[in-house]
């Protein structure tokens, strides 16, 4: 026992030194060990990015930082993301007259034809919402969809009433099930040819030149194509095009005679689910909810 006592005494003396060596760091009254992997700033809003960076520079092992009380503009997000590529940040994004947490799975601007519009640059901040599965940015001035490359898990996408000409980024969204593209300036549908999970597609009022890319989408349940090759109500889609699509897609309900939102487009159980999910910021799977809605 006498031999153990000096050893225990030595361990007691070394313990404070070990703790001191490990160390802690404090920011906005939040104290964490320097070897932590997760930081939650809670209700503390960051006002000084330089001070935040000085804090994070002392945490070499951190991989997740939640700071949802801080409203972040695009330039601030870019600055932190570039400096700390190893860290996943939880932010509240601020763009236009909207705010959105980066952990949201659904988002809609809830715009109509009288709402103030936002540009592609405004929406590019959404690339930080990696978990988004449903997105509605209809009734805006979107002409560049590049930011969609960072949202590979989208299942519902509404881009109606914008200025889109190039839909190439849509080819990177293999999980898409519902897609509204009406009232844009789209000519080439090729990027849609690989979307084998797509159930609902609305391309009314565009400038489509070739419909062949749609002929392989045999899983489609609904396809709205009224005036999809022009904007003139007096020049209907050629009957030959309609016949070709009906032959290629015998199990698809194809509507070539009704306006983009008429003919039952918004009277389907899946639209009811979409309306419900965009009332909040949480994605609702169609299969799970349709039975309830019906």
What are these regions (language model features)?
Residues 1-6:
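Positively charged n-region of N-terminal signal peptides that target proteins for export
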Residues 7-16:
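Bacterial N-terminal signal peptides
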Residues 21-143, 147-165, 169-187, 191, ...:
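Concave beta-strand-loop units of leucine-rich repeat
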């Amino acid at each position: 026992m006498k031999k153990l006592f000096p050893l225990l005494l030595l361990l007691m003396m070394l313990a404070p030194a070990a703790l001191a060596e490990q160390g802690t760091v404090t920011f906005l009254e939040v104290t964490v060990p320097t070897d932590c992997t997760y930081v939650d700033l809670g209700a503390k809003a960051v006002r000084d990015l330089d001070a935040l960076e000085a804090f994070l520079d002392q945490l070499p092992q951190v991989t997740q930082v939640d700071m949802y009380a801080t409203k972040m503009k695009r330039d601030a997000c870019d600055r932190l993301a570039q400096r700390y590529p190893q860290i996943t940040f939880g932010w509240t994004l601020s763009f236009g007259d909207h705010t959105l947490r980066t952990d949201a799975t659904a988002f809609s601007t809830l715009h109509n034809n009288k709402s103030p519009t936002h540009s592609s640059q405004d929406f590019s901040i959404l690339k930080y919402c990696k978990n988004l599965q449903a997105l509605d940015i209809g009734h805006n001035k979107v002409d560049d969809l590049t930011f969609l490359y960072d949202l590979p898990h989208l299942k519902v996408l509404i881009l109606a009433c914008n200025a889109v000409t190039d839909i190439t980024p849509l080819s990177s969204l293999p999980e898409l099930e519902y897609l509204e593209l009406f009232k844009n300036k789209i000519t080439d549908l090729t990027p849609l040819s690989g979307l084998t999970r797509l159930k609902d597609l609305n391309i009314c009022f565009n400038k489509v030149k070739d419909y062949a890319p749609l002929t392989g989408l045999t899983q489609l349940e609904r396809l709205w194509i009224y005036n999809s090759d022009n904007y003139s109500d007096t020049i209907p889609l050629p009957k030959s095009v309609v016949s070709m699509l009906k032959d290629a897609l015998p199990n698809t309900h194809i509507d070539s005679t009704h306006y983009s939102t008429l003919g039952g487009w918004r009277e389907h159980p899946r639209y009811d689910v979409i309306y419900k999910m965009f009332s909040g910021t949480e994605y609702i799977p169609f299969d799970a909810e349709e039975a309830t809605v019906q």
